[in-house]
Amino acid sequence: MFDFEKLSASKFYVAPTSERVVEFSPSDIDMSNVAKVLSVAVDARAISVEAQDGYVQAGGRVNFRLAYLDKDGTPKGVDYNADFTARVDGEFEEGDNAWCDVVISESDVEANDTLTLTAVLELKVSAIKRDEIEVLTGADDCYVTTKEIFVPTYIAQKTVVVPFDDEKNVGGEIESVLGLSATVVPLKSAATEGGATAKLKIYAIATYVESGQI
């Protein structure tokens, strides 16, 4: 006779990457005064992620930062936000603990009679899924060897906001800041008693005007 027991466990699931194109045309910029587009920086993040049976509904925001020269040769910077929604299909169930990582794979700006900002998003949705595993716990009239196994179980996750500031001496007087782009790269993480620690590196690019030069 064999004895079985059902254990509650968790498993990590990553859906196939989904692509979403976001276009935005602001109406408050005078294109007749735009002489040259210098650069466009884009970042995006998911704000809401809701798991349903067979898919995840994600919503987020794209931030466009545009630097350009006006007809007088003066550099200027503008900042726009565009909201988006996307459906990502996968092996999801309602109630799964899901989250979405957003990567900008491509960006473009078209400046003709109107200004059109475009970003191509890659959405990677992950989830912690609850599962039941049936395991053999005992057997009669058999030679039995036992081995301890560890069953992964999801407990909790937490998001914290960590302020960061730094100062660099550029050797001159900054007339105006046209834009700032920052990227955070995780380097290391470790579990501790009652929490966790993470080591990160931040790369920041600032575009500014100094003595009339960008």
Model regions: which residues?
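Viral structural modules
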Residues: 1-214
